[in-house]
Curated annotation (Swiss-Prot):
PROSITE patterns with a match to the protein in the record: RIBOSOMAL_L34 (PS00784)
GO cellular component terms given for this protein: ribonucleoprotein complex; ribosome
GO MF assignments: structural constituent of ribosome
Protein name, UniProt field: Large ribosomal subunit protein bL34
InterPro entries for the chain: Ribosomal_bL34 (IPR000271), Ribosomal_bL34_CS (IPR020939)
Pfam families: Ribosomal_L34 (PF00468)
Record keywords: Ribonucleoprotein, Ribosomal protein
Family the UniProt entry places it in: Belongs to the bacterial ribosomal protein bL34 family.
């Protein structure tokens, strides 16, 4: 059986990257929440 997680840098960046997050209001909220929490990594 094939596993569900098949890593790919491109698809990872395109869905969870910083620039993608900044495009939408919800994505910006995610970045803001992670900054407030003090995360070292804000996005992938």
């Amino acid at each position: 059986m094939k596993r569900t997680y098949q890593p790919s840098v491109i698809s990872r960046k395109r869905t969870h990257g910083f620039r993608v997050r900044m495009k939408t209001r919800g994505g910006r909220a995610v970045i803001r929440a992670r900054r407030a929490k003090g995360r070292a990594k804000l996005s992938v």
